[in-house]
């Protein structure tokens, strides 16, 4: 658990009391910090507690000044816990971006970002309702029974691997020849707020050559952004524009304000008005 977490600023503050300074605690703190950064994609500031109260106050003042500066110079959006975990937040925007660190409490919520419309428990994923090339999948990237999946530090590549050679070989063949070649990936991680959650990592594509070479299923990320969809059972608003990256649709929009916000944030992507 972090000492102080400001989700509005992707910022965590850790208070280092004297007992943190042992070699063992320093190692444990570094491991924990790495886990937090991976899970929350945030910056960590540390306040070192000592007998010098002036020095402690100086550290605190510097952090407070930094937060105040961001409030003044950046567009401040208050954190809403309900919206943070609600698929509708991303459905209404028309896209989901891994750089925003979207998190969800259940696999069904992950699937619902792409129009699944699930009401209850869902296993580890499902097929995309609007794109027959994509599966939606939640994976654990830590020791997990017979599975040993690995996500690279830069999150551009990951592998799926079963420790039983026969099962692994069968899965490799099935993934290459039968299953959908692309994934909307969510990583199962320990939440800094307690429990576990699912973090969107992006849009990935099966790398067949690498898979054959490694003997384990390998993927590469093709986009951090994916379009979201209203449930198939609901009537959705009219799409007024779409965003593309190298010919791949990455967003669809229902109002001019969202189009303007997206275009301002991502000028490198092409926005095309929908035909009436």
Which residues does each predicted region cover?
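Switch/connector loops and helix/strand junctions flanking conserved nucleotide-binding motifs
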Residues: 21-23, 53-58, 197
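Acidic, glycine-rich low-complexity segments with interspersed aromatic residues
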Residues: 98-197
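Charge-rich interaction segments
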Residues: 73-137, 249-276
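A short beta-strand motif that forms part of the nucleic acid-binding face
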Residues: 16-19, 51, 189, 223
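Core residues of folded domains in eukaryotic genome-function proteins
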Residues: 9, 181, 200-202
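Short beta-strand-loop-alpha-helix junction that forms the active-site gateway
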Residues: 1-31
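Basic, glycine-rich
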Residues: 34-95
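Compact mixed alphabeta submodule
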Residues: 193-275
């Amino acid at each position: 658990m972090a000492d102080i977490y400001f989700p509005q600023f992707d910022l965590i503050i850790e208070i280092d009391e004297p007992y943190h300074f042992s070699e063992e605690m320093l190692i444990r703190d570094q491991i924990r910090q790495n886990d937090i950064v991976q899970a929350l994609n945030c910056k960590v500031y540390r306040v070192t507690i000592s007998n010098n109260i002036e020095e402690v106050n100086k550290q605190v003042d510097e952090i407070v000044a930094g937060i105040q500066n961001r409030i003044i110079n950046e567009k401040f959006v208050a954190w809403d816990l309900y919206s943070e975990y609600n698929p509708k937040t991303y459905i209404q925007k028309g896209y989901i971006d891994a750089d925003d660190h979207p998190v969800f409490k259940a696999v069904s919520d992950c699937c619902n970002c792409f129009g699944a419309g699930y009401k209850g428990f869902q296993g580890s994923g499902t097929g995309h309702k609007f794109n027959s090339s994509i599966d939606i999948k939640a994976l654990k990237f830590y020791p997990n029974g017979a599975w040993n999946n690995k996500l690279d530090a830069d999150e551009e590549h990951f592998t799926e691997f079963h420790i039983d050679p026969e099962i692994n070989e069968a899965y490799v063949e099935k993934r290459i020849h039968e299953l959908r070649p692309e994934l909307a990936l969510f990583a199962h991680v320990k939440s800094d707020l307690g429990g576990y959650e699912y973090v969107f990592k992006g849009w990935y594509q099966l790398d067949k050559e690498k898979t054959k070479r490694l003997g384990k299923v390998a993927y590469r990320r093709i986009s951090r952004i994916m379009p979201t969809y209203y449930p198939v059972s609901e009537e959705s608003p009219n799409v007024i524009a779409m965003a593309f990256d190298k010919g791949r649709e990455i967003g669809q929009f229902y109002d001019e304000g969202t189009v303007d916000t997206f275009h301002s944030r991502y000028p490198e992507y092409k926005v095309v008005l929908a035909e009436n």
